Amino acid sequence: MDESKKARSGDKKKEKAVAGILPHSNKPARVPLIAVPSHPVFPGMFIPIVLISDSDMKAIDYAMKGNGIIALFVLNDKFLEKNNNNAQQKLIIDYSKDIYSVGVTGKIIKKINLPDGGYNIFVSTFDRIKFVKVVLNDKFPIIEIDYLKQIPVRKDDIQSKAVYGSILLRTKEIFAHRKMPEVQLNMVNIEDKGKLCDIVASTISSSKNDHQIVLETLNVKDRLKKVLELIYEELNLIEIQNKIAKGIQERLEKQQKEFFLKEQLKAIKAELGIGDKKSSDLEKLKTKLKALELKGEPLEVVEKELEKFSLLETSSAEYIVVRNYLELITELPWRDFKINFDKLDLQKSKKILDKTHYGMNEVKDRIIEYISVLKLRKTQKGAIILLVGPPGVGKTSIGAAIAKVLRTKFFRFSVGGMRDESEIKGHRRTYVGALPGKIIQGLRITKTNSPVFLIDEVDKISASSYGDPFSVLLEVLDPEQNVRFRDHYLDLPFDISNVFFILTANSVETIPRPLLNRMEIIEISGYIDNEKIEIARKYLIPKVLSENGVDKDSLKFQSSSLVQIAQEYARDNGVRNFEKYLNKIVRKVARKLIENTEVKSYQISNDNLEEYVGVPVFRKESMPNAMYSGMVMGLAWTNYGGSTLMIETVKTESKVGGIKLTGRLGDVMKESANIAYTYVNSIKGDLSISKSFFEKNIIHLHIPEGATPKDGPSAGITIASAFISLALNKVVRPHLAMTGELSLTGNVMMIGGLKEKIIAAKRSGVEHIIVPKANRVDLEEIPTNIKSGINFYLVDNMREVIKLLF
């Protein structure tokens, strides 16, 4: 019975040997396992291994108490990727899945304790082994292993001999390129082909998988072929590395040679006392341009221009052109200027705007909204705003205040009367004296790509044979295009989308519709007398006193004198003329202070105002002393504010009826007069007007101050009311004024400039105003202090107007 068991056991051992597995014999079948994350270890090596995990160190201590034999297996890639290439001690390893199945045995020759608590062991490796199973995994793994037997090459195998010879030859080439010691070269000259493969594979910088394949290949013939493949891959890699190294070496040698020659040239010129202006300019430009870190098209253009510049003589005209062009590039803000959004304070911003400008609430609110959006977005974004209003209301000066609020730079340029588009977009460099346009010049001066740009008087641009500046502004103000704005002189794409554009105009009538669509329009109305006086007290008087060196205690203004200046000298919508008269007064006082040092203080009142500013420029507006039939007061709006407009009509007998117009009326107002005439004629029966009135009379319509041009549609209902008053021979109710456009069917349509018209009416003592019902919203937005003391009547048909006339 025992003999049969032994026989069967012997048969099993023979079967294992045939399969490439050696019987255990006297070698240990169970050993501690060390899992390493690096490349596989081959038999016949002497290697150091650093261990830091507790389980590995305990396994080493256990092995050294016995025969010192350990098993070395490599962690596979799946495990390392899953654990981010970290093989630290706290990771849980499933040895049946996480290690390669073939490893080696090794004997611990020496152990060194490391300062951080780890071990550095030196191991001599022996046999290829196969992982069978874990038999104990308490504090460290002990595994059962099978010893693998390699299949040797037959002595008469000519192919293997040829491969063996190639390996010897190519390995020596690799060692020669790597400049390895002669000891390692001698190691190659061994007869054992399997051992040769292991030694060569361990010295080649192949992948972990390739090394593992060599380790797992038990057939030496196949192992020879695999190693030869790896050798050729290594030689190809060496060839590529040598080419790269050679190219780098050649470039370095060329640079060193150029540097040496340049230094020699500098030394020779210094010895001869010859200055090298071009070299100095070139070096300065290169240093500045390098700091910009340009990319793409700008970098390519700069490199070409630098190369051209280096070949030019300083005496040539093009030398200056190229240098100026490169200097422009160095001075432009190519990098983003970052606004510190946390420092943008809404309350402080509001205070700054209120301190510098009175009123203008819509503009201030828009700026506060813009700052709020910036703080929320945390990214820069430009804006395009058009301020429309009469002269002198602060449209231009508000730009500097906005820049201060946004903590950025301010740049202003006027386009009033501009006819050449090159002023905005630059001249091409082929022209003599070419310059960049105002946009690029502004960026160059402010040195930031997010400044506040104020483009003044945009409504006064005029087209010519030199191009249309309006068309250029379309590109500048289009968010889709200004990301890559291309100035003719610079001829490179430049991002101006972060610029805060403010444009000013007195009227939008001359601005093309496509340009208006690109802008947010904010209308700034003129100031009433009370507002002008408040502005004078808070802003203008301290300003003119400071500018003229007059102490505030040396000059006082009575309130009545300021009212008189506003009403009789500076009646425009703005405060520019008001400031001029204040300046005139202060200058005269300054002269008196110098000429008569005994008088220390002066006071301006109604009694002495004419002494300083002369006779009044305007008469005080009021209702006529006497009203007649055919007379009606209308209201007009101009770029300089509102005014009253007295419509006068008389009839003269004639065989043929008709209408005669005088008072320098414009085409639109003439059409309004004809429409009013036709409308009243069409309803004469309803108003009990005789048929002969229009058939046998010529109606003469006149608007006084004939030297002043007058135009616009808003006098339609006023003219019709004058015709009705004349036809009925009735005087309209006292202190009545009106404004509204009249259609041919009697509808009353919307008008503009309502606030200014009401101000003018109030100044003239008007108590009743007829307004189109379509202007209800405009009327509600007008401050109560302006509307106080006036009764308003909203109408949408001429018949409603007629009921209010008498």
Curated annotation (Swiss-Prot):
Induction data: By heat shock.
Pfam families in alphabetical order: AAA, Lon_C, Lon_lid, LON_substr_bdg
Keyword terms: ATP-binding, Cytoplasm, Hydrolase, Nucleotide-binding, Protease, Serine protease, Stress response
The keyword Hydrolase appears for this protein: yes
Catalytic activity reported: Hydrolysis of proteins in presence of ATP
Organism superkingdom: Bacteria
GO CC annotations on file: cytoplasm
Binding residues annotated for ATP, in chain numbering: G389, P390, P391, G392, V393, G394, K395, T396
EC number, as in UniProt: 3.4.21.53
Record: active site: S714, K757
Signal peptide per UniProt: none
Enzyme class at the top of the EC tree: hydrolase
Lon N-terminal domain boundaries: 31-235
Subcellular location: Cytoplasm
Entry-linked SMART domains: AAA (SM00382), LON (SM00464)
PANTHER family cross-referenced by the UniProt entry: LON PROTEASE, LON PROTEASE HOMOLOG, MITOCHONDRIAL
Complexes and interactors: Homohexamer. Organized in a ring with a central cavity.
Family: Belongs to the peptidase S16 family.
Protein name listed in UniProt: Lon protease 1
Source organism: Borreliella burgdorferi (strain ATCC 35210 / DSM 4680 / CIP 102532 / B31) (Borrelia burgdorferi)
